[in-house]
Swiss-Prot record:
Residues in coiled coil: none
Free-text cofactor note: Manganese or magnesium. Binds 1 divalent metal ion per monomer in the absence of substrate. May bind a second metal ion after substrate binding.
Binding residues for a divalent metal cation: 78-79, 170
Protein name: Ribonuclease HII
PANTHER family xref list: RIBONUCLEASE H2 SUBUNIT A, RIBONUCLEASE HII
Top-level taxonomy: Bacteria, Bacillati, Bacillota, Bacilli, Bacillales
Length: 255
């Protein structure tokens, strides 16, 4: 009895590798619906394979540390919010489990919102430890954004319930005695830093969404404090509020 296209599609969607797909008994079925199902499954498997390969590449720096010290406790550190006109800069410091596998981890700006939220939930529930650090708009004005970012990162490290032995940091160096590696574009090169990027992004976006409930005119829930047209028009109309960075232009020129 010949299987229906729906039945064949279900079988094809259960295939886990391209090799298995090409050797599947339905591979030579010439029905258009079957061939379309095979093409879709191949595309999905190729995408998954690419994500797996990228994930392996992004464990390079962690593995180099573990070669030297198999018991190393590696903490990734990244920040979000250096560029906005309002709100804090937020850092996150996660320590991944040894069996971590979060396909799709990347620089948070490159990850779609739905996937970002999915990864964030998985990370919060499964990592060995994580903590956030915040430097306020007032501290950014007092110290400058670079120093405030360092402060936020150190606060995240200090908040950890597990003491790390090594730090992987996105494009920064910290006044910290622990061995540290600073990686340019680290959130696209290290799974630990990418995890920090995702978690910090979701945390800060949530913070700005909450802030928008008290200050709806600025559109913080959509612009996260960046200088969008709506945000700039609101500054012109109603002025600035406590979460605005007074050392940033164009706000600085308005004072």
């Amino acid at each position: 009895m010949t299987l229906t296209i729906k039945e064949v599609t279900q079988l094809i969607n259960a295939v886990n590798t391209i090799e298995e797909l090409e050797n599947h008994e339905c591979f030579l079925d010439e029905r258009k619906g079957v061939q379309n199902a095979i093409a879709r499954r191949r595309k999905a498997l190729e995408k998954e394979q690419a994500l797996k390969e990228k994930y392996v590449e992004m464990t390079y720096f962690e593995n180099e540390i573990l070669k030297e010290n198999p018991n190393a406790i590696i903490c990734g550190i990244d920040e979000v919010g250096r560029g906005p006109l309002a709100g804090p800069v937020v850092a996150c410091a996660p320590i991944l489990n040894s069996n971590h596998n979060y396909l799709g981890l990347d620089d948070s700006k490159k990850v779609p919102v739905t996937k970002r939220l999915e990864l964030n939930e998985a990370l919060k529930n499964e990592v060995t430890a994580f903590a956030f650090g915040i430097a306020t708009a007032e501290e950014i004005d007092e110290f400058n954004i670079y120093k405030a970012t360092q402060i936020a990162m150190q606060r995240a490290i200090d908040g950890l319930s597990v003491q790390p032995t090594h730090l992987l940091i996105d494009a920064m160096t910290l006044d910290n005695a622990l061995p540290q590696v600073s990686l340019i574009k680290g959130d696209a090169r290290s799974v630990s830093i990418a995890a920090a990027s995702i978690m910090a992004k979701v945390f800060r976006d949530d913070y700005m969404t909450q802030l928008s409930k008290d200050y709806p005119e600025y559109g913080f829930e959509k612009n996260a404090g960046y200088g969008t047209k709506q945000h700039l028009l609101a500054i012109d109309d109603i002025g600035i509020m406590k979460e605005h960075r007074k050392s940033f232009e164009p706000i600085k020129s308005l004072l």
